[in-house]
Curated annotation (Swiss-Prot):
A Gene Ontology biological process term: rRNA processing
HAMAP family, alphabetized: Endoribonucl_YbeY
Family, as annotated: Belongs to the endoribonuclease YbeY family.
Name of this protein: Endoribonuclease YbeY
InterPro entries, sorted: MetalPrtase_cat_dom_sf_prd (IPR023091), YbeY (IPR002036), YbeY_CS (IPR020549)
PROSITE patterns, per database record: UPF0054
GO cellular component: cytoplasm
MF terms in GO: metalloendopeptidase activity; RNA endonuclease activity; zinc ion binding
Length: 143
């Protein structure tokens, strides 16, 4: 299940965007063989910068932050994903793809972090990118 809260007013949030986020979470959980509740907070750059400063000691806006809550695979609540829609819009323009693709990517990326994936090592990065592209392709949002 996906709970989405819009805490910003810089970028319009419509049904299409909400559906893409919900589908991205669902496909990611299915791909990983997991079930549970994922909370998505849609924020602006100022909001995510304050979280980034508090939790990562980085005083800059970022695109997505994940806060895992599950201790094991049986936990129902998996955690929170915070996405800056303002940053997503900037990055979509910079990377030359749609805003919807960027938000879907950030959603998948954030949920994979909730499930224990990371990209500190080269091999971990490769595995995570393959999973992201497979899910985005299933959403019809490949590059």
């Amino acid at each position: 299940m996906t709970e989405i809260t819009n805490l910003q007013d810089k970028v319009d949030v419509d049904e299409t965007l909400l559906n893409i986020i919900t589908q991205a979470v669902s496909l990611t959980l299915n791909e990983e063989g997991r079930a549970g509740v994922v909370s998505i907070a849609l924020v602006d750059n100022n909001y995510i910068q304050s979280l980034n400063r508090e939790y990562r000691q980085k005083d800059v806006p970022t695109d997505v932050l994940s806060f895992p809550l599950a201790d094991d695979k049986d936990d129902e609540v998996l955690g929170d994903v915070v996405i800056s829609l303002e940053k997503a819009a900037e990055q979509a323009k910079e990377y030359g793809h749609s805003f919807f693709r960027e938000v879907a990517f950030l959603t998948v990326h954030g949920v994979l972090h909730l499930l224990g994936h990371d990209h500190y090592e080269e091999e971990e990065t490769r595995i995570m990118r393959e999973k992201e592209e497979k899910i985005l392709s299933a959403l019809g949002l490949e590059r």
